[in-house]
């Protein structure tokens, strides 16, 4: 056993986590990010699939690395051939931007116009839909969902982990009520700004486009924010039009890293399989 562990560790000695950043014209500041580069990246000729993984509220770009254990997860999934060797980009547009164009920041524009072009120019990543996916936890799940619904032509799959998709409004305990994106000039929570950005304002147009983004939705059964119900409602709505391209899992846990890490371990292989189907069908 000791030999196999050592051999496994050695096999992934060359996978790396590096820190990077790019200036965003949309935000007027930088977008810091951590980037996972798989073993063999430095000598590879063919471009790699890229996965964008978004953090939760009041966090930053290091959360998937430091708390989410993404390097170990990716290394192990790749070793088991459950995940194509991939570049994983973990950016931050700010601790409370919710990845939308809101009252304070144009974070959605920043991702599309600044982040994606930077990554695809600097890193050896694919630039086609079948080579690009997105996932996120809580606020990041909210963001991953919105990006998938509004720009389905960009993503081959999405991971929606414990998504903070409160319909019609967030609970009093939600960080969203304190976010500058959803606060008016008087400092009060702006219900119209929340409603405008929420996935419910995007899903009809998504369905009309007809381009399906397969989605893995997962939440904890003891989530104190009621997300297990919100996620179930999302699943049921998507199930009406993409029955074979949406999954929902409820696991034992709350709104915490045990659930978020489990979501990545379970969700990334499924997302990968969906992207591979698209890849082969081109």
Predicted regions and their residues:
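Non-catalytic cap/lid and distal C-terminal segments of serine-dependent acyl enzymes
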Residues: 12-282
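Bacterial N-terminal signal peptides
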Residues: 1-7
């Amino acid at each position: 056993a000791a030999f196999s562990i050592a051999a496994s560790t050695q096999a992934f000695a060359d996978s790396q986590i590096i820190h990077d950043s790019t200036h965003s014209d949309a935000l007027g500041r930088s977008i810091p990010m951590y980037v996972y580069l798989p073993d063999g990246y430095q000598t590879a000729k063919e471009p790699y699939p890229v996965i964008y993984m978004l953090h939760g509220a009041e966090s930053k770009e290091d959360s998937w690395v430091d708390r989410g254990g993404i390097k170990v997860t990716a290394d192990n999934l790749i070793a088991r051939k459950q995940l194509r060797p991939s570049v994983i980009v973990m950016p931050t547009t700010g601790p409370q931007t919710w990845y939308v164009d809101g009252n304070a920041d144009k974070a959605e524009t920043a991702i599309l116009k600044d982040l994606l072009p930077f990554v695809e120019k600097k890193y050896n990543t694919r630039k086609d839909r079948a080579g690009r996916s997105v996932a996120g936890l809580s606020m990041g799940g909210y963001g991953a969902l919105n990006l998938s619904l509004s720009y389905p032509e960009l993503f081959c799959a999405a991971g929606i982990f414990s998504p903070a998709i409160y319909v019609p409004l967030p609970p009093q305990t939600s960080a969203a009520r304190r976010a500058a994106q959803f606060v008016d000039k008087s400092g009060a929570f702006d219900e119209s700004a929340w409603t405008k950005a929420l996935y419910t304002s995007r899903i009809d147009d998504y369905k009309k486009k007809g381009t399906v983004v397969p989605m893995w939705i997962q939440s904890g059964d003891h989530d104190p924010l009621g997300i297990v119900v919100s996620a179930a409602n999302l699943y049921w709505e998507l199930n009406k039009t993409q029955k074979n391209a949406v999954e929902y899992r409820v696991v034992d846990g709350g709104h915490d890293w045990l659930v978020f890490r489990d979501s990545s371990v379970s969700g990334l292989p499924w997302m990968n399989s969906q992207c591979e189907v698209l890849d082969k069908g081109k």
